[in-house]
Regions:
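Short, intrinsically disordered C-terminal tails of secreted or membrane-associated proteins
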Residues: 343-349
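Polytopic alpha-helical membrane proteins, predominantly small-molecule transporters/carriers
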Residues: 1-341
Length: 350
């Protein structure tokens, strides 16, 4: 299977994660311009996640000298390791639907910093407890700065005109709930994956990252039948509306799922080199990317009378500074140096 063998490659994968996770929600914004409800977008999103995972599993996950091919791994895995991957997909799906509700109500520039920022704090903390790599003082100092960025986003939202959000309080509450739930999915998924899969044999019963992502995607897809159906009923949306959608609208949602899953796959692959804590934290720089999309492309704070330009720019700069400082603090962790993949010595070397 395809794996990352060096720190520079792992860091590049985390950058891809950051860009993908921060950009996929643009597909929801594009669909919303056509008055396509988020509940319907999310069906196509789940399809995109599943299709991308299957494609990666039988291409990147089945070729290469490292680890174990996907089909062979499926024959040796046990339920005790498969179930955590499936459950992590269910947990993530609930949290992500709540985040989509937050984006739909409060905008990307607000929902992402609150929801994903809170998820980052919890997910990084739980990942560190599960796999303690790095200096906790530096890591948690970085997380404290991320909390500052979340607070600044909430403060900026109070200056947002009411016309910019359909239900701002609902959006903030949904984003907070999304962050609280989403913080648990990443450590849950890592429980199912064989440790050090890029440089060590796959442990009996455990899953390769590609197979784990298949069950994660299945958890997302099938839990959607419950979670999204409930959101459809509360929102007055019917399945008939979904099937009346155009090919373009469905394609946009599928594209969003593919973008998100590509980013997540690269993050999991990088985790063997950088460690789950660092990999997850670096990838969640997506919050800044999403805020930039919301502010600079979708102009979510465009009313200068309610949100003076200097104020919005100051908040954005402060958010960027907090995120950059947190990244620097986390990057200084020696775990990044200790977990670099080293080629095994040849037979003639000691």
């Amino acid at each position: 299977m395809f794996v990352a063998h060096s720190l520079p490659i792992a860091i590049c994968f985390c950058v891809v994660t950051m860009l993908g996770w921060g950009s996929w929600a643009n597909t929801q914004k594009l669909s919303g311009k056509a008055h396509w409800p988020f509940q319907l977008v999310y069906w196509d999103y789940a399809v995109g996640v599943l299709l991308c995972t299957i494609l990666f599993t039988f291409t990147l996950g089945s070729h290469g000298p490292a680890g174990m091919a996907a089909l062979a791994n499926m024959q040796t895995m046990t339920a005790s390791f498969m179930l955590p991957a499936l459950i992590s997909g269910v947990i993530f799906n609930l949290s992500n639907i709540l985040l989509v509700v937050g984006i739909d109500s409060a905008g990307m520039a607000v929902a992402f910093p609150i929801g994903v920022g809170l998820s980052l704090v919890l997910g990084t903390a739980f990942s560190y407890i599960q796999t303690p790599k790095g200096q906790p003082g530096l890591i948690f100092s970085g997380l404290a700065l991320i909390i500052v960025a979340m607070i600044l986003s909430s403060v900026a939202h109070r200056r947002l005109p009411k016309a910019e959000a359909t239900n701002p309080r609902k959006g903030i509450i949904a984003s907070i709930l999304a962050g609280l739930v989403q913080g648990f999915f990443y450590p849950q998924l890592m429980r199912s994956i064989s440790p050090d899969f890029s440089s060590s044999p796959i442990l009996p019963g455990t899953l390769t990252p590609y197979v784990a992502l298949v069950f994660f995607a299945l958890g997302v897809f099938f839990s959607n039948l419950l979670f999204n159906t409930l959101f459809m009923r509360t929102g007055g949306v019917t399945y008939a509306e979904y099937f009346r959608g155009t090919l373009r609208l469905h394609s946009i949602g599928v594209l969003g799922g593919i973008i998100w899953m590509i980013a997540f796959s690269f993050n999991i692959i990088a985790s063997s080199v950088a460690g789950p804590t660092i990999s997850y934290a670096l990838g969640q720089g997506a919050t800044l990317i999403a805020a930039l999309w919301g502010l600079l492309v979708w102009h979510e704070f465009r009313d200068d009378r309610a949100v003076p330009g200097n104020w919005s720019r100051s908040c954005l700069w402060a958010m960027r500074s907090a995120w950059a400082a947190s990244r620097r603090l986390q990057d200084r962790s020696p775990a990044l140096e200790l977990t670099v993949y080293l080629e095994p010595p040849s037979k003639g070397e000691k």
